[in-house]
Amino acid sequence: MPSSDRTNDECEIARIIHDSFGWALTKNRVLFESIFAKDDDFFTYYPDSKSTVVGWNQFEKFLKSWMDPRNKAIGFDIRNLRIVVSKTGEVAWFSAIVDDEGEFDGKPWGLKDVRWTGVLEKRGGSWKICQQHMSEANDEGSK
């Protein structure tokens, strides 16, 4: 894969990664649906064990609470983003640190310094997030 193609893919992937949080600022459902693979084996591990998602249908159920007018995304920050595109140019993986904040019915919610990794696949010329994993560092065990 030529380096210019790789650079273009990395820029596109970075945009998709940012849009995977940014869509919520305007509740842009069309953008949300364009980002993720609508597969039965799509999965997401969130920091809490109760929110593990397997399959697009289960993931889409989260939209109900995300689209609720009482839920308001306030902002997000993605930093230390690393993207690697495979030699074939069909698969990519990433890692980053994320902050995400909002409020539901006036009560704040959010993530701070969450580690985020994921895998994307190029399908029909478009990159889709196929899996993602978010976790909080636990440095207590290393003391």
Residue ranges and their predicted role:
Residues 49-51, 100-101, 136-139:
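Solvent-exposed loop/turn segments at secondary-structure junctions
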Residues 20, 43-47, 91-102:
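Short, well-ordered beta-strand segments in beta-rich or mixed alpha/beta enzyme
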Residues 11, 29-90:
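A solvent-exposed, acidic/Ser-Thr-rich amphipathic alpha-helical stretch
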Residues 100-110:
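Short, cysteine-centered beta-strand-loop-beta hairpins and adjacent loop/turn segments enriched
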Residues 20, 59, 63, 78-84, ...:
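Hydrophobic/aromatic beta-strand elements that line small-molecule binding cavities or substrate pockets
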Residues 93, 111-143:
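Short beta-strand edge/turn micro-motifs at domain boundaries
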Residues 8, 15-16, 75-78, 115:
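Short, conserved clusters of charged catalytic residues that mark active-site
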Residues 1-38, 143:
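Short, low-complexity N-terminal intrinsically disordered segments enriched in polar/charged residues
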